[in-house]
Structures are given as structure tokens and as C-alpha cells.
């Protein structure tokens, strides 16, 4: 089976067919999903989705786009909310210098607050880093000097240096459908180089659908295609990638539980032999 550790099931693209989205994921062999928070104040929405489906979990946190809106929420409130049994992660939080909907200062403050919450709870932090490799690395190094914390660089599109620094700090690196894009040659080289026991896969659905669905609404079932791209880059089988990334997920997301009924991975979904 595979895990999609980062999707946004509360987004309007899924409002009319969420049960169908979940069913298609299972049919493709995706047994566990994590719906990711972008606003702490929408906690009840994420919680409701997770509580309605046995194998869906959720996170608590503020996306860097929205950092300026929720700086009034203290770290201890994130810690308190994270105690829900199906809340398995903190975030997503981090730095986005591409859009900068929040100031860099607000993003950095929010990032550090979420790191503190991850450190206190032991839950992994879902890190968003776009066009901000240098500052992301600087904050990670600075914060690790104050105490280690579990984390993953989600939807990784950064450079080799950031990926290697993250792994050196004990973090994980996650690849999305971007990995399958024609121009992502350098990213595929990074996916081939990193230790397999530090790699995760995700969709970031409804965005960034992998080839051959690029330009369409992404959904968790399509994580199979990203996993196949990792396998191709490393010259190993999809089954090996699925096994490793699933084990990695449950090692990092310690509150998540493996599904009672493990769906069979549909290798043919990617055209693999």
C-alpha cells in the first residue's frame, strides 16, 4: 500500500465527491491519508473529516500564506488541539517567498512557533518551503540547536543542499507530482540520491497532479504515479518504494495507525509491469 501524507480534503474541489475520492484512493492501493491544516481556526472541519473515515488523519497549523492571520494563536493552543487522537502532525507551516501573502517576518515567526509545537508534542511538522531554501535551512539549523524535532519538507521543490541538510538533521523529504514534470530533472536526481528511508510521497491534492493527469484536479489516488516516478529515478520497483515510504510514514507519524484492511497496491495504475 501507499500513504498520501499531505492532501487538502476540505478544499471545495472535493466537497461534492469526498467519499468517491477516498474510495478511488483505496482502489489504487492508498490506505492512509492525512488532510492538512491551512488555518488553525478550521480545526473542527479537519477533525470532522478524519472522524468520519477510519484511515484519514489530520494536522493542526497555519499555512505561511495565512501566517499574519493567526499570530494571535499561542503555541500552547496548537499543542492542546494536537492532543486529539486523530491529529498526527503539526502544520503546514514554513516559508513561501513565491507569493508572500504574509510578510517574511510573519512567516518566520509562525514557522518557529510551529517548530516549538512539534518539539513539545513530538508530532512531525509539515514544512512548506517555496523559493526560500536559504532562510528555511537557517531556521532549521538554528531551531535544531535548541532541541531536535520531527519534520518533513513537504512537496519538495528546493535544491540539493537543502535536501541534504534536512536529512543530516534527521528530517524527511517528500515528493509530489512535480517530480513527474518534464522540467524536474534535477528534482529526480535528488530523489535518486537521498536515502530511501528518508523519503515520503504525497499529492498536495487538489493541486499539482502528476503526469499523466497534469492540469487536472489532483486526488490521493494519483500518489501512485509519484511513487512510480521515484522508483524510476532510483531504478527500483514501485513495490519497493511503496513499502519503504509506508514504513517511513508510520515511523515518523507515530500516532497514526496502520489500516485494519490493507488495500492492495494497483501496480498497473502507472503502467508498470
Which residues does each predicted region cover?
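Mid-domain alpha/beta scaffold segments of enzyme catalytic cores
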Residues: 1-273
Amino acid at each position: 500500500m501507499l500513504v498520501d501524507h499531505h492532501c487538502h480534503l476540505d478544499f471545495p474541489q472535493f466537497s461534492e465527491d469526498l467519499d468517491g475520492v477516498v474510495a478511488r484512493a483505496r482502489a489504487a492501493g492508498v490506505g492512509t491519508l492525512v488532510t492538512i491544516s491551512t488555518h488553525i481556526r478550521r480545526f473542527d472541519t479537519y477533525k470532522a473529516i478524519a472522524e468520519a473515515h477510519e484511515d484519514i488523519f489530520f494536522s493542526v497549523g497555519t499555512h505561511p500564506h495565512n501566517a499574519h492571520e493567526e499570530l494571535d494563536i499561542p503555541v500552547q493552543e496548537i499543542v492542546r488541539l494536537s492532543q486529539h487522537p486523530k491529529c498526527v502532525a503539526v502544520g503546514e507551516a514554513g516559508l513561501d517567498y513565491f507569493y508572500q501573502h504574509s510578510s517574511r517576518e510573519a512567516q518566520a515567526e509562525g514557522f518557529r512557533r510551529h517548530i516549538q509545537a512539534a518539539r513539545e508534542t513530538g508530532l512531525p511538522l509539515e514544512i512548506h518551503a517555496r523559493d526560500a531554501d536559504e532562510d528555511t535551512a537557517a531556521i532549521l539549523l538554528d531551531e535544531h540547536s535548541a532541541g531536535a524535532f520531527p519534520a518533513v519538507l513537504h512537496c519538495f521543490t528546493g535544491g540539493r543542499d537543502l535536501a541534504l541538510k534536512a536529512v543530516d538533521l534527521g528530517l524527511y523529504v517528500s515528493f509530489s507530482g512535480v517530480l513527474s514534470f518534464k522540467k524536474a530533472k534535477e528534482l529526480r536526481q535528488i530523489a535518486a540520491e537521498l536515502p530511501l528511508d528518508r523519503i515520503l510521497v504525497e499529492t498536495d491534492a487538489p493541486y499539482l497532479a502528476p503526469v499523466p493527469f497534469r492540469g487536472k484536479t489532483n486526488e490521493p489516488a494519483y500518489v501512485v504515479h509519484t511513487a512510480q516516478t521515484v522508483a524510476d529515478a532510483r531504478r527500483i520497483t514501485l513495490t519497493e518504494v511503496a513499502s519503504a515510504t509506508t514504513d517511513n510514514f508510520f515511523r515518523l507519524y507515530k500516532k497514526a495507525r496502520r489500516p485494519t484492511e490493507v488495500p492492495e497496491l494497483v501496480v498497473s495504475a502507472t503502467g508498470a509491469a
